[in-house]
């Protein structure tokens, strides 16, 4: 399961589907999945389900029979030169499939024909309103969870009810459905598997409430992920939406600075923590204050603080009953949410 984002959620959905279908797969997933009590399960059958990350071209070390490509966006620009370079890597990934290979691909990926040039295996597309497998008539319940009509080859095949939030998870579910169908798993098993999937650690994880303030944690650290998470939160009932964002790596922050400012501006209040360096050193002259400055050029809603203690004090002083606070990022920002809740 590959793509710039959505890998962990889609792999987790597929885990539920395969296990519901009485398969005994080996599973390697990039988050804590309650179904298997962790992120790794050793199975006894032929299926090996894993995430495939493009960073450093590591997914080219795999020899898959089935590939899922969820999306292709600019990321890991400390390794790739640009989006074209990333697309070349995904084209090489598709070339790893032989003539009997199966490719599941998002119909919205641009210039798919170029990526698929030379591939002679089976292709199943998925999307919203378009694709071999697609969703129509999408509705959200009072909790923000989606229900939609599933169409396969333009034929209505039933309603799908998800237990997770947001349009991005509809797309993840469609990818999982298409993969399940390609593996000859019954639609009933696919439906039951999806209905049993309640999410994975640090993916729109509702941590709790304090004095009526709901605290959610999410791993989003790319503009596309951030936008999807904010849009999912907007389906919930709330007064104000606050995002506490910890950028991840200097190279990503520098390369996508304006995109970060644009998507974060969709929240009512934005609080910025220092950049989480991860594998990098501060050599690019970029900081979280740069995001704050860009946001505040258009609307005075962003605040930068250098410590978690200052952020916690600010959040608790600004937010009230009925508000939502999302801690967001791939670093240790989740600890802040736990501090706010007193966990």
Place the predicted regions along the sequence by residue.
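Helix-to-beta-strand junctions that scaffold the AdoMet/dcAdoMet cofactor pocket
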Residues: 97-98, 237-238, 320
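Nucleotide phosphate-binding/pyrophosphate-handling subdomain across enzymes
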Residues: 143-144, 148, 152-269
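C-terminal helical cap/extension that packs against the catalytic core
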Residues: 144, 261-321
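Phosphate-binding loop of NTP-binding sites
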Residues: 1-107, 111-122, 174, 180-181
